[in-house]
From Swiss-Prot:
The keyword Transport belongs to this UniProt entry's keyword annotation: no
Recorded GO CC terms: cytosolic large ribosomal subunit
Name of a matching Pfam family: Ribosomal_TL5_C
Oligomeric and partner information: Part of the 50S ribosomal subunit; part of the 5S rRNA/L5/L18/L25 subcomplex. Contacts the 5S rRNA. Binds to the 5S rRNA independently of L5 and L18.
Gene responsible for this protein: rplY
Annotated protein name in UniProt: Large ribosomal subunit protein bL25
Primary role: This is one of the proteins that binds to the 5S RNA in the ribosome where it forms part of the central protuberance.
GO molecular function: 5S rRNA binding; structural constituent of ribosome
NCBIfam families found in the cross-reference section: bL25_bact_ctc, PRK05618.1-4
One GO term (biological process): translation
Protein family (similarity comment): Belongs to the bacterial ribosomal protein bL25 family. CTC subfamily.
SS bonds (residue pairs): none
Length: 178
């Protein structure tokens, strides 16, 4: 389980001092949950996120434990280092909006015909209760030829999960190389 510290002071000087000590500044918020300003050790946080199996994961802040999902993050545009992360605390049975990653498998037929695979949408916006949240959408790209794409409406439908993105948006496709 990922452990963090609750920030008592939310001043700019305090945030700078924490960053200098190797901490990542974060906020935990959600429906029915009081906002918590906190900080996590940067390297263990990144390692934990890479190894986790589910979108929802537990964090411990002080004596409280929250089930959270990464809602948004900010990176330094030059160094590409994480600066800040927003964590949405989820409550069982309460619908929330999430962004679910798209993963693809296979090698498109169109790559042999001088095509390039274009991942247009890396995440799909959905609304559901946390217990129905899919970990990812898996797309088989093997049958795709040049100028073909998979749209949001072609994705696998999950029960009790409402996709918020428009049906005609391309998720992944093969375009002709110039």
């Amino acid at each position: 389980m990922l452990e963090g510290v609750i920030r008592e002071s939310i001043t700019k000087a305090n945030a700078k001092a924490l960053k200098k000590d190797g901490y990542l500044i974060a906020n935990v918020y959600g429906k029915g949950v009081e906002n918590v300003s906190c900080a996590f050790k940067l390297n263990p946080f990144i390692k934990y996120l890479k190894e986790k199996k589910h979108l929802i994961f537990p964090v411990k802040l002080g004596d409280k434990t929250f089930e959270v999902v990464v809602q948004e993050y900010q990176k330094n545009p030059v160094t590409n280092e994480l600066i800040h992360v927003d964590l949405l605390a989820v409550t069982k049975g309460v619908k929330s909006k999430f962004k679910v990653p798209v993963k693809y498998q296979g090698t498109p037929v169109g790559l042999k015909n001088k095509g390039i695979l274009m991942l247009s949408k890396k995440r799909i916006s959905v609304e559901c209760a946390p217990e129905h949240l899919p970990n990812h959408y898996l797309v088989d790209v093997a049958p795709l030829d040049v100028n073909e794409s998979i749209l949001v409406r072609d994705l696998e439908k999950h029960e009790n999960v409402k996709i918020l993105d428009h049906d005609s948006i391309a998720v992944i496709g093969v375009i002709k190389a110039k």
